[in-house]
């Protein structure tokens, strides 16, 4: 079995972290937790 290069391992780890953060952000923005978010423009009607 061949060993993988460190650059490939680091790039896969960074890609996984970015995809996880993106998924968490989409879930927070559009999923069930979005009901708790406030709209600052609605709070400050002029």
From Swiss-Prot:
Keywords in alphabetical order: Membrane, Thylakoid, Transmembrane, Transmembrane helix
GO CC terms, sorted: plasma membrane-derived thylakoid membrane
Segments traversing the membrane: 10-30
Pfam families: PsbN (PF02468)
GO process annotations (BP): photosynthesis
Highest taxon, organism lineage: Bacteria
Major subcellular location class: membrane
Compartments it resides in: Cellular thylakoid membrane
InterPro entries: PSII_PsbN
Membrane topology of the entry: Single-pass membrane protein
PANTHER family, alphabetized: PROTEIN PSBN
Role this protein plays: May play a role in photosystem I and II biogenesis.
Record-stated family: Belongs to the PsbN family.
Entry protein name: Protein PsbN
The species this protein was found in: Synechococcus sp. (strain RCC307)
